[in-house]
């Protein structure tokens, strides 16, 4: 029988998620294992990682989803199909000792909108992730692995530049409320729900 682990598997789509999750050590109580698929935009790879985490006995699997490449066409269709299969679902296999809850958390355009919410709220539509990242440059942010390695932790860096996690959570909540109210499908983050799903210290 598989023994359930207390760790949470968090599946991101790239190195930004990997380094941000690592930077949360000491901020949250949960023991998080970041998982990054080989091909960031592949729904096949994402599903493969979800299935692997289920079989490894994680009782919570959280997927951080960048929406910038899932807005239309086949990418959108494949994502919606995957989301329908796994989002907000419980996988219960008592014979294997498996009891797993899976949830997706979307960021539009990408995780950087969550970083922006550390500082400000916005409903501006960004036409590309690069456009959004450029707005973060005023705070010294760079979307490069060299920067992620040298900034002494993304969360700590964002707060050192005047950002605030509680402010980001409030802004993310407001972004969802205004999205639903206005019928908007852009510039929002579900990371407030992510932090509600894990315990902060």
Task: Label the predicted regions.
Residues 38-40:
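Conserved helicase motor
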């Amino acid at each position: 029988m598989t023994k359930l682990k207390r760790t949470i598997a968090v599946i991101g789509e790239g190195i930004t998620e990997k380094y941000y999750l690592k930077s949360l050590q000491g901020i949250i109580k949960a023991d998080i294992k970041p998982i990054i698929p080989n091909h960031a935009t592949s729904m096949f790879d994402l599903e493969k990682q979800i299935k692997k985490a289920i079989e490894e006995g994680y009782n919570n699997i959280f997927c951080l989803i960048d929406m910038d490449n899932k807005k239309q066409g086949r990418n959108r269709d494949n994502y919606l199909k995957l989301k329908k299969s796994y989002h907000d679902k419980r996988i219960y296999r008592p014979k294997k000792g498996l009891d797993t809850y899976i949830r997706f958390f979307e960021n539009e355009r990408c995780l950087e909108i969550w970083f922006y919410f550390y500082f400000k709220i916005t409903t501006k539509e960004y036409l590309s992730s690069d456009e959004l990242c450029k707005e973060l440059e005023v705070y010294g942010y760079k979307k490069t692995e060299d920067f992620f390695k040298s900034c002494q932790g993304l969360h700590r860096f964002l707060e050192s530049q005047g950002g605030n996690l509680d402010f980001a959570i409030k802004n993310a909540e407001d972004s969802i409320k205004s999205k639903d109210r206005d019928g908007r499908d852009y510039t929002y983050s579900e990371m407030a729900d992510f932090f509600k799903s894990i315990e902060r210290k």
